[in-house]
C-alpha cells in the first residue's frame, strides 16, 4: 500500500540514525511495524529508512518526520509531499563509502564506521553521517553489493575511500540542515516562508502578482546562529551559498571594492537559485552621513543598486546579519531591499536543551549526563556558548584518559576509545570555565552562597524569596494571577549585617546570572561614558536573563540630585538608572538588588514603587540569629568541650555577622598560636648553625681573595716564593680558625636528628608525610657528613703545608688552592640547602602541632576582649527609625509586642 504524507522535521534524537517516524494510526493503515523498512519517494529521488512510531501529537496530521539527510536523498524539503510504502530489502555484503571532504584515517576506522551505521538502510548516492568525538563526518554511498537498498549487518564489509566524491566537491551548497539549528523554531518558520518558498515555488508569487522578497536582515547578539540559519536555508532550498565578509572585498584601488561586490552578485544570478550572505553587514554598509571614508559611501550605494537590480524573482536572495542594526544605512532597511527583519534572540530553556542535544548528538555521553539540568543552569548562554561548553566537557574527558594513551603509537587501542565517555562531572567542571558571551564584558560571578550559609535573618530571607526567587522560578504563576513582580529591592542596614551575602544567596538559589556593580567602575571622566556604562549593564543583563544586578553601596552611585554644581555626573547617572528601571519591559527577568548603609542620602525617586519596590532593613542579628551565625562560622572548627555557643551568643549583643566571623577567626588564630608553641631542638640547633655559617662568610671571602692573589703570583713561575707561601698558610689558617666551632655546631645538629625521627614516628601522620620526613632527615645527615669531611680535609691541608718547605712547586700550590676553593664553595652552597631544610622542618612541626588543635573557651574570651561590636544601640535606633519612615520594615514597637529582642 502507498500513502502520501507531508514531510516534517525530525526530532533531535533521531538525526543521523536513518529513521523515519510516522504516527501509530498511519503505520497501522500502511501495515507497518516498528523496525520495518520504508521507501520514501519524492519528485527528485528516493530515500530508504527504518520506521518507528511517532508521538500521539502527530496523530491525524498525515506527516512523516525525517532528518535533513533523508530529505536530501529524497530531494524534498519540509512541507513537501512524499509517497511512502513498505519494502523488503536484502542484507549488504559490501558497502563502499566516500567522504564529502578530504580526510585521513588510520587502521580500525572502517570498523568504527561500521559500528556506527550498523542496522541502517543504505542505497547508492545516499548520505550518512558519522559522529566522531563531537564532530559529524558526512559520507556518500558509492556502491552497494548487492545493488539497490540494503541493510548493514555484522557480516557487511565496509570499505572507505579517502578521496571525496567529485560531484560533492564542486557544489557550493552548505551541509547544514534545519535539525542542526536548535531553539529557533519560529525564526526558521519565518525565514522559510520568506526565502525557501519563493525559491522552490515561484509560481505562487506569480499567481498573486507580487514580487518575492529580495532580502532578509537577521538581527541578534553574536553566537545566536544567524550564519548557521542562513546556511541551513541555502541547503534545504538547494541554493548555492555565497558569503561576503567585509575585509575580503575591500581593495586599496578606486572602484575595485565595488567591482568585487558586483562579481559576487553576477555569479549568484548565473548560478541561481542562490543565497548571498553578508556577515556583519554593518561593517560594510554603515550610515553614509556618519561614514568617515569615501569607500564606505560608494560601497553602500553599490549595494543599494545591486539589490534594486535583482531580477531573479526570488531566485537570488540577500541575507544580512548584524548585532548593530541601528548602525546600518537607513536606505537598506526599507521594503524592496531588506524586506523583513528577523530578531534572533538568546534561546530559552527549551531552546538550550535542543542546542545541547545537537552538540552532544555525536558524543559518547555517560548515563549520568542530564541535559535538562544543563539547560536549566545555562541562563544567558547562546548557541556558540553551549557549543563551547560541550567542547570543553569533551576536552576534559580527553584529558582524563590522556596519561594512559601512547601518543607516539600509530593507532589508539580500541578499548581506550570505547571507554572514552563524557560525564556529568566533565560538564560541571566545564561550566566553571565557560560563561555567557554577553557577560564577558561585565563583572559576573556565579555565587556559591546558599541560604543555609547565612545565619538568622529569616524574615529578610523570606522577603527576598518572594520578591526575587519566586518571580524568576515561577514566572507563569505571577502572570496567571496578574501580579507584576518587583523590579528592585533595596537592602539597607549597618555595615557587616550580610547585605552582599544575601544578594549572592538569592542569585544562587534562583539560578540566575549575577552582575556585581561597584561605583568606581561606573564613573568616567569622559562625557556620557558613565551613563553608557549603566545602559550597557542593563542591556547585558536583559540579554542573559534571568539576571540579578547587584549595586553595592548604591548611595555612591545614586545620591540625591541637585546637591551642588559638582554633582552633574552623578545626576546624569541617577537619571539613566531611573530610565532603565522604568524601561524594563515585562517580563524581562531582570531584578535589581541594591545595598547601602545610608538610605537617607539616596535619591527619593529610586525608592518609589515601580523602581526599587521593596525596601528591606537588614538588622543586627538577635540572640537566635547570632547562635546560627556562630554555628556557621564554627562548623569546620575543632571546638573544645568547654565552648558553649549559646553563652557566646548571649555575650555578643550588638555584634553583626561580620563581627562574629572576625571573633571566630581571632579565637582560632589564638589557638593555633598557642599550639604551635616553641620550636623543636633540631630547629634551634640548625638555626644556630645557619647563623654561624652566615657570620663566617666574610672570613671565607677574605681567604678567597688571598688565594686568588697567590694564584696570580705563581702563574708565571714554577714555584712559590716565601711571601706567597706565607700568604697561602695565612689564608688556610683563617679558614681553620672559624671551622672549629662550626664542627661543634654540626655535631650538635646531628644529635638532634634521631630525636626528630622519634617524634615523627610517634605522631599520627600520613604514610607519605612520614616518608617525606625520613627522607629529609637522611638528606640533612648527608649534607652535615660532607661538611665534616670538608673540615677534616682542611686540617689535612694544614698538616701538609707544615711538612713542606718554603720552596713549593706551582703544581702543589695549585692543588692546595683548588681543594681550599672547593671547600669554601661547598660551605656556601650548603648554607642555602640548610635554610630550605629548616623551612621544611618548620612546616612539619606546624602540621604535627596543629593537627589536633582545639579552640577553647578561653580563646573566645580573649577574642571578645579584642573584637568589639561595630554597631552601637544608638546607630541601630537610627536604622529602625528610617525603616519606620519607609514603612516597609518591622518596627521596634511590633518587635516588642511579639516579645523579640530589641537593640
UniProtKB/Swiss-Prot annotation:
Gene3D superfamilies according to UniProt: 1.10.8.60, 2.40.40.20, 3.10.330.10, P-loop containing nucleotide triphosphate hydrolases
Pfam families: AAA, AAA_lid_3, CDC48_2, CDC48_N, Vps4_C
PROSITE patterns on file: AAA
Residues the record lists as binding ATP: 220-227, 493-500
Gene Ontology cellular-component terms listed: cytoplasm; intracellular membrane-bounded organelle
Keywords: ATP-binding, Nucleotide-binding, Repeat
GO terms of molecular function: ATP binding; ATP hydrolysis activity
Family per record: Belongs to the AAA ATPase family. CDC48 subfamily.
PANTHER family associated with the record: AAA-FAMILY ATPASE (PTHR23077), NUCLEAR VALOSIN-CONTAINING PROTEIN-LIKE (PTHR23077:SF171)
Name this polypeptide is given: Cell division cycle protein 48 homolog MJ1156
